[in-house]
Regions:
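Domain-scale signature associated with acetyltransferase and cell-envelope carbohydrate enzymes
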Residues: 1-246, 250-264, 268-269, 273-274, ...
Length: 329
């Protein structure tokens, strides 16, 4: 473990000269070879630990450990506000939206264990034993201080709250991440919103995807606005465009479905203009209505319900010859 020390008065003055501030500089611990230029225009709150070669630029950090060589830049809030298990032990209502087959997720969950917890409900002692082990593991992983691993890149994100971040993780432009664990090599992209999440090694969540109470397994990919809730995705699954609710997606599940609604390609304003112009079409030379002689008269002919054709250009009343009554026999 990297040894940490408190800041000297000279380092504190240098940090403030670079536009940095802290709620309490005495709670900030740094590595032995710390240099003041590692922080720029940032604000620190609570207990913060900064490892060697880590950088914090224009960000607010509260109660976090920043690992060796990691970059935190342009982050609205990287904070741990309370004691958290970082997504471990969260119940996911998979296969049954009413919660009859709830699986408690954790960062070492496998498809086999999840299957037993979801399907073998007729063995309550087995389920109780598994859930007890998961609860104990979640308590072991709980902490009041969040963690960013080594060689991570967190840029342009807004709110990252109660998230444990593994080594080599990349977060680029995420909107909000809350109560989650991102394992080694995971990637979270632009406009992603995630709550109560476990993202396993090498997983990717990108392009506006929304995830709530989900397990995203090793090398899985959720992309192009995919929305998922109460679902489990295991190794190498790939889902885009659509949505998932209470899904148990085994390894190599693929979904690229997107519902489409057909509509007219003509814009509403253009359709209105076309309708208006067709109703106000000028009368032709064949028309015998008042518009032919008076400019103030209506400039269009209207359909006649009793006309033999769709449009009547002759306004002469139509006379109908009554049929003779049948002769009684």
């Amino acid at each position: 473990m990297t040894p940490f020390r408190k800041l000297t008065s000279a380092e504190t003055a240098a940090l403030e000269a670079l536009g940095n501030s802290a709620e309490d500089w005495s709670k900030v611990l740094v590595s032995e070879d710390f240099k003041p230029f590692q922080l720029l225009q940032s604000h620190l709150e609570g207990d913060v630990e900064i490892a060697a070669e880590a950088r914090i630029v224009r960000s607010r950090v509260a109660n976090y450990r920043i690992g060796t060589g990691s970059l935190v830049e342009g982050v609205t809030a990287l904070e741990c506000r309370r004691r958290s298990a970082f997504g471990n032990g969260v119940g996911v209502a998979t296969m049954n939206e009413c919660g009859g087959r709830t699986v408690k997720i954790f960062d070492r969950l496998s498809a086999q264990v999840a299957y037993v917890m979801a399907v073998y409900r007729h063995r309550p002692q087995t389920i109780a034993a598994l859930e007890k082990m998961v609860d104990a593991y979640a308590e072991e992983r709980s902490s009041e201080i969040g963690e960013v691993g080594s060689d991570c890149r967190i840029v342009g994100a807004r709110f990252i709250r109660e998230v444990r971040i593994g080594n080599g993780v990349e977060i680029d432009g995420a909107s909000i991440l809350e109560n989650a664990t991102l394992c080694d090599g995971a990637r979270v992209g632009v406009d992603v919103k995630a709550y109560d999440l476990i993202a396993a090694e090498g997983s990717v969540i990108d392009n506006g995807s929304i995830v709530e109470r989900c397990f995203v397994g090793e090398s899985c990919r959720l992309d192009k606005g995919f929305t998922a809730a109460e679902s489990l995705f295991f190794a190498n699954s790939h889902c885009e465009n659509g949505e998932a609710a209470s899904i148990f997606a085994g390894p190599y599940t693929v979904s690229h479905h997107k519902s489409a609604c057909s509509r007219s390609s003509t814009p509403a304003a253009a359709r209105t203009r076309a309708t208006t112009s067709s109703r106000a079409a000028p009368c032709t030379s064949r028309c015998t209505c008042a518009a032919a002689s008076s400019p103030a008269a209506p400039t269009s002919c209207r359909p006649r319900s009793r006309a033999p054709s769709r449009w009547s250009w002759d306004t002469t009343p139509t006379t109908t010859t009554p049929r003779p009554s049948p002769t009684p026999i």
